[in-house]
Amino acid sequence: MMLEINVKKRLGQLVLNARLTIPGQGITGIFGISGSGKSSLINLVSGLIHPDEGNIRLNDRTLIDTANNICLAPNQRNIGYVFQDARLFPHYSVKGNLCYGIKRFNQQEFNRIVRLLGIEHLLARYPLTLSGGEKQRVAIGRALLSNPEMLLMDEPLSALDLPRKRELLAYLEKLSQEINIPILYVTHSLDELFRLADFVVLLDEGKVAAFDSLENLWQSPLFEPWQEQGQKSAVLSLPILNHNFSYKMTALLLGEQQLWVKLLNGDEGKTVRICIRSTDVSITLTVPEKTSIRNILSGKIITLLPKGNQVDVKIALGKDEIWASVSTWAAEELQLQIGQSVYAQIKAVSVM
């Protein structure tokens, strides 16, 4: 299963030119600054707008092919769409909204989706009585119950306040693990990208600047505008190794070494995404005998980037890499050089 996109579309002064093959599972984040063509890209997939030229294929079906005069209507594409606003029917109950558009009602599947989204207690209520987060959960349920081959989500959290965003993010994380269809997710929020996206399409002025896993793209110069000024960081996906319930800590496997974080929910082997900022990493040439820092990992220097009165140091920890920011004074005193074995003292780890 996959989505193949090869289209051009003029949108006022912007020309959207996209050529992509998106995997048939997981969440692909569509990311970029405002006006880069994010929403237009998924509207082309949905059929709400048509390309000037090109084609889009979903699995073995051609959705549109301008050269061969093929154009399936939106309702023929078997694609679910969740908009920024829930767009529920006010005169239908929650159950009525959920059932709208179902071709063949399946009670078992209905119950599964309702439980997954935590909306069992809302079925008899009407949209006017729901919070913004509840409305969006109902909208997501309605889209899923149409049994789509793909789900499109256009900034579904943008109209919500922070508590509701956090609430719905937790449901979206759960959703991504439970359903077996690809999701295209438009956002301009780094937090949503970190929490949800397996892959990222970075759009810049209508063109695909990059398409890769979030972990790889985060290291790219293309993502520097979104990183904290003057600070480098590494985004890693690591499996849970074990838990220490006495100290309320969880060990993640980083190469062949352990990285301790605050206690997490999850079985051994579950993958967790983390971020390590360069300002939270210091360097020592020997293992400290007594220290409060729990994460001291051995590695090798692979890059030295002088910058003003500091040096950014990239350290390889097996196949993974992190950054440390040290003063020029410290770098000279330690005589840091590429290929040198060092110990990275990691003072803080952010779990996404």
Swiss-Prot record:
Instruction: Describe its assembly.
Output: The complex is composed of two ATP-binding proteins (ModC), two transmembrane proteins (ModB) and a solute-binding protein (ModA).
Substrates-to-products reaction catalysed: molybdate(out) + ATP + H2O = molybdate(in) + ADP + phosphate + H(+)
Protein name (Swiss-Prot/TrEMBL): Molybdenum import ATP-binding protein ModC
- State a GO cellular component annotated for this protein: plasma membrane
Purpose of the protein: Part of the ABC transporter complex ModABC involved in molybdenum import. Responsible for energy coupling to the transport system.
**Predominant place of localization:** membrane
Q: Where is this protein found?
A: Cell inner membrane
Q: What one GO molecular function would you report for this record?
A: ATP binding
Family, according to the entry, reads as follows: Belongs to the ABC transporter superfamily. Molybdate importer (TC 3.A.1.8) family.
Gene3D superfamilies with a match to the protein in the record? 2.40.50.100, P-loop containing nucleotide triphosphate hydrolases
The lineage's top-level taxon is Bacteria
Q: Which UniProt keywords apply?
A: ATP-binding, Cell inner membrane, Cell membrane, Membrane, Molybdenum, Nucleotide-binding, Translocase, Transport
Q: Where would I find the ABC transporter domain in this sequence?
A: 2-230
Using the record's annotation, list all stretches that form the Mop domain. Answer: 290-352
What EC number(s) are associated with this protein in UniProt? 7.3.2.5
Which residues does the record give as ATP binding sites?
32-39
Bilayer topology reads:
Peripheral membrane protein
